[in-house]
Swiss-Prot record:
Site feature Reactive bond 3, where: 15-16
UniProt GO molecular function: serine-type endopeptidase inhibitor activity
Domain remarks: Avian ovomucoid consists of three homologous, tandem Kazal family inhibitory domains.
Name of the protein in question: Ovomucoid
Keywords: Disulfide bond, Glycoprotein, Protease inhibitor, Repeat, Secreted, Serine protease inhibitor
Entry keyword annotation includes Disulfide bond: yes
The organism's taxonomic lineage, starting at the top: Eukaryota, Metazoa, Chordata, Craniata, Vertebrata
Protein origin, superkingdom: Eukaryota
Organism of provenance: Tinamus major (Great tinamou)
Domain (Kazal-like) ranges: 3-51
Length: 51
């Protein structure tokens, strides 16, 4: 499972809650928050939902 993070990082993310669990075992609140981290820290998607 992958998430398309082209166009990231973004300076601001919305507050919508659609959790994704990163390979760093951290829960990200939505795709924007996840993709910002993915671009900066080379995190990949563990699974959809909370860790």
């Amino acid at each position: 499972v992958t998430v398309d993070c082209s166009g990231y990082p973004k300076p601001a993310c919305t507050a919508e809650y659609f959790p994704l669990c990163g390979s760093d075992n951290q829960t990200y609140s939505n795709k924007c928050a996840f993709c910002n981290a993915a671009v900066e820290k080379n995190v990949t998607l563990g699974h959809f939902g909370e860790c």
